[in-house]
Amino acid sequence: MVYVSLEDLIYALFVENKSTIHDIAKALKIDASTVSRALNNSPRVSQKTKDRIMAKANELGYQRNLLASNLRKKKTSTIGVIVPRISRHFFSSVISGIEETAYDAGYNVIICQSLEQLKRERKLVETLLANRVDGVLLSVSMETVEYGHLLKMKNNGTPFLFFDRHCEIEDVSSVLIDDFQGGFDATEHLILNGCKNIGHFSGPQELAIYRNRTAGYRKALEKHKIPFKSELLIRSRLMENDGAEGAKTLLSLPYKVDGVFSANDVAAIGAMKYFKKEGVRIPDDIAIVGFSNEPVSAMIDPSLTTIDQPGFQIGQIATKLLLEEISNAPSAKANMAKTTILKSSLIERDSSRK
């Protein structure tokens, strides 16, 4: 059921464009119902009549009231997207995949960013629902360890789907990369380049992506019989200053750290800047691997080895799955939930070549 506020109903029914179908009908001396059918491309109206009506509509500057039309159809042909930060290349590439796929399917996209704040994320969900989007694509904030707002969205029947960062909610689909394998590959790469004491910058372990990247890090250590040292695992919000603080902590340890795997490129770059300021040579003294392949990672000196994520493809797949859920009956949605896991790839650059 779609609930419509009184304000929306008044707007949809009475705040029309300057020209209406009645103006077109009056000018052509035909019924308004015929004009309506023609504007909706009904086969009941001849092409000749359609052409006359379209010409007059253009002449009068007529524009359809999409809100009224959508209210009648009980859909808006709009999906909402919430990302932590639009400025991150990974999320902007996901958005590109979403927008292109949605556009091809006749949908508009509303893009929002939580700025890693749970309070803001809650408000954005409320706003999107108030705007009656047909569905939502969401990558949760670092603060999202409680998700009553998402359960509310599920319970009111609005289709939504996670990408990249997700919460474990039953019957909700996700499109992810193999974060465990990415963490494993990054760490093993450092080990194969001679590193033994490898620091790891991670995010909140309540979020599956950081938990899985950390698990991959630990598995690589285990495979190569390198003991895990808890002081080498540094958790933060993974901003650039967090990377610098993490680097400072690693340099204060009583033994030499010779490698760093950061769960994102931003913190890795912060660490690199700090190491260079302290006279630490990269990769000779410390080799570094990031995660996400931000464009800047290829331009800094030395260039940053990183894990690449197929952001555009994630956006495409997530949108296609969401549109499938939107088009199916509510009773069928619970049976459609699926987790799609895509592969990541290691891009070797100068920060880890010894």
Predicted features and spans:
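Alpha-helical recognition/docking segments in bacterial nutrient-uptake
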Residues: 1-16, 20, 74-188, 192, ...
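Short acidic capping loops at alpha-helix termini that bridge into adjacent secondary structure
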Residues: 197, 228-232, 281-287
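Flexible loop/turn connectors
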Residues: 6, 248-354
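Short beta-strand segments enriched in small/hydrophobic residues
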Residues: 27, 32-37, 72-87, 189, ...
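N-terminal helix-turn-helix DNA-binding module of bacterial transcription factors
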Residues: 1-77, 353
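Short helix-capping segments at alpha-helix termini
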Residues: 104-105, 156, 221-228, 253-256, ...
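Hinge/beta->alpha junction and helix N-cap segments in small-molecule ligand-binding domains
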Residues: 84-93, 111-120, 140, 165, ...
